[in-house]
Amino acid sequence: MAFHSLLLLCLAGLVFLSEAGPVAHGAEDSKCPLMVKVLDSVRGSPAVNVDVKVFKKTEEQTWELFASGKTNNNGEIHELTSDDQFGEGLYKVEFDTVSYWKTFGISPFHEYADVVFTANDAGHRHYTIAAQLSPFSFSTTAVVSNPKD
């Protein structure tokens, strides 16, 4: 049983590493400063139809909804915002994990998986936030790159 779990985890990791990288900025996605990628560790596939909300921290120290979307068949969301709108600040990406797992009849431990990060404090950048989900754990990583003209 432990070997089977380890094998599934390794396979999911391979999928994560092979598909989680950003689309080459400067190609079709050059105006996409924030991209989200979600993978299902249990099934070893992209997590389709995951609701994602992006919040920005206000001067009053509250979270204001900034953008939202649902992952596509590749487990990705592009065009959440534009270069002009995505300014310096503190952002929170919220993955609605409970709704995703309940579609498969699974009652997960986490209601949401949140990633809080500071954006564009060292100049304009493009961000890919990748999340790997399972019912009782999640892992996130980010790829930060300079945009190409």
From Swiss-Prot:
User: Which is one Pfam family of this protein?
Assistant: Transthyretin
InterPro entries the UniProt entry points to:
Thyroxine_BS (IPR023418), Transthyretin/HIU_hydrolase (IPR000895), Transthyretin/HIU_hydrolase_d (IPR023416), Transthyretin/HIU_hydrolase_sf (IPR036817), Transthyretin_CS (IPR023419)
Q: Does the keyword Secreted apply?
A: yes
Localization terms from the record: Secreted
Q: Which UniProt keywords apply?
A: Gamma-carboxyglutamic acid, Hormone, Secreted, Signal, Sulfation, Thyroid hormone, Transport
Residues that hold L-thyroxine according to the record = K37, E76, S139
Please list the tissues where expression of this protein has been recorded: Highly expressed in the choroid plexus.
Q: Record keywords: Endoplasmic reticulum included?
A: no
Q: What are the recorded GO MF terms, alphabetically? A: hormone activity; thyroid hormone binding
Sulfocysteine modified-residue sites: C32
Pull one GO CC term from this UniProt entry.
extracellular space
In this chain, where does the modification 4-carboxyglutamate occur? E64
PTM notes: Sulfonation of the reactive cysteine Cys-32 enhances the stability of the native conformation of TTR, avoiding misassembly of the protein leading to amyloid formation.
Q: Describe its function.
A: Thyroid hormone-binding protein. Probably transports thyroxine from the bloodstream to the brain.
What family is reported? Belongs to the transthyretin family.
Name it.
Transthyretin
State which gene encodes it: TTR
